[in-house]
Design a protein with these regions (language model features):
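Helix-loop-helix junctions within the multi-pass membrane cores of secondary transporters/permeases
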Residues: 96-179
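Hydrophobic alpha-helical transmembrane segments
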Residues: 16-18, 39-41, 61, 88-89, ...
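Hydrophobic transmembrane alpha-helices
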Residues: 1-75
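Small-residue-rich segments of transmembrane alpha-helices in multi-pass membrane proteins
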Residues: 33-42, 78-88, 217-230
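Short helix-perturbing small/polar motifs within transmembrane alpha-helices
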Residues: 9-17, 60-63, 75-122
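C-terminal transmembrane helix-loop-helix hairpin of multi-pass membrane proteins
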Residues: 7, 148-230
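Alpha-helical membrane segments and immediately flanking helix-loop junctions
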Residues: 11-14, 51-58, 67-83, 87, ...
Length: 230
């Protein structure tokens, strides 16, 4: 990867981060979209899609609505994709083992997204007071600047989260990849299925109990029918 690739990834980080909370909200911030979008910009959309699919289930029931500030799933997807696309050939990994290792490293680093998101909201609280005072004083231009600065604070929070994930994740990959390569390659398929099952459990946990039971029974019967028809 060259500097232009990292610049593109940074732009996608800011764009998807703004879509997550502050601007438009057309769902490009979802891992299932942010991952492939980052991968496409870096020339490897398949890696981004694999990362996005694994992360989407895990975070589908945790949205940044109201006062809720979950770990930043958007930047986890962006950061993990950058890690997988940019460091694989250096550590001697590719394919699903590299994807799994990148995801496992990026997920805990997503907690930094909560910290930066809280800081951005605190800054925006002060900007809201300044904007209100400016409006009451008749300074509409200053009020508009305060409004736009609120977008900047969220954008910088997203970029900072992605930077932490990429920088710390790269250090962890280069340091521990030689030790973890064997274990990841050996447990690759079972680990992949484990993440999918955990994601499915998280998703079912957010649904209505009666509806969840109905969905489970329908899926179970459908699977039996498919096996019987084969």
């Amino acid at each position: 990867m060259v500097a232009v690739d990292y610049l593109l990834a940074g732009m996608i980080s800011v764009l998807t981060g703004l879509d997550r909370v502050a601007l438009v909200q057309i769902m490009i911030s979802r891992p299932l979209v942010a991952g492939p979008l980052t991968g496409w910009a870096l020339g490897n959309p398949l890696v981004g899609l694999e990362i996005g699919m694994l992360l989407e289930l895990l975070w589908l029931g945790r949205l940044p609505v109201g006062a809720a500030i979950p770990p930043d799933d958007t930047q986890v997807a962006v950061g993990a994709t950058v890690l997988a696309a940019g460091t694989g050939h250096f550590v001697g990994l590719d394919g699903m083992p590299l994807v799994l290792l990148s995801v496992l490293i990026a997920i805990p680093l997503g907690k930094f997204g909560q910290v930066f998101d809280k800081l951005a909201r605190q800054v925006n609280d002060r900007l809201a007071v300044s904007g209100y005072n400016a409006l009451m004083s008749g300074h509409t231009a200053k009020m508009e600047r305060c409004h736009l600065l609120g977008l900047v604070s969220f954008g910088l929070a997203s970029l900072a989260t992605a930077l932490v994930i990429v920088l710390v994740g790269t250090f962890v990959l280069f340091t521990f990849a030689p030790v973890l390569i064997g274990a990841i390659q050996e447990a690759g398929l079972s680990l992949q299925y484990s993440l999918i099952l955990v994601g499915a459990a998280v998703l079912l946990g957010t649904t209505n109990v009666n509806r969840g039971i109905s969905l489970f029974c329908t899926a179970f019967i459908g699977t039996l029918l498919v096996l019987w028809l084969r």
